[in-house]
């Protein structure tokens, strides 16, 4: 867990991540839930989505 957190911190600054999350949350709240209907895939989708969201654009 520790290595994962250090990796996240290195890639994306907390302030920018927070701002990005707040702005995206409203717009994609409805749309995002659809793709993963299965209970098993929801966690995976969420994890991938979060990583991509914070680190994709620099």
From Swiss-Prot:
Q: List where in the cell it is found.
A: Nucleus; Chromosome
Q: What's a GO biological-process term for it?
A: spermatogenesis
Q: Which UniProt keywords apply?
A: Chromosome, Developmental protein, Differentiation, DNA condensation, DNA-binding, Nucleosome core, Nucleus, Spermatogenesis
Q: In which tissues is it expressed?
A: Testis.
Chain segments annotated as transmembrane: none
Q: What one GO molecular function would you report for this record?
A: DNA binding
Q: Which Gene Ontology cellular component terms are annotated?
A: nucleosome; nucleus
Sequence segments annotated as region (Disordered): 20-41
Q: Which domain of life is it from?
A: Eukaryota
Summarizing the function annotation, the protein's role is: Protamines substitute for histones in the chromatin of sperm during the haploid phase of spermatogenesis. They compact sperm DNA into a highly condensed, stable and inactive complex.
By sequence similarity, the record places it as follows: Belongs to the protamine P2 family.
Query: Can you name this protein?
Result: Sperm histone P2b
Predominant location: nucleus
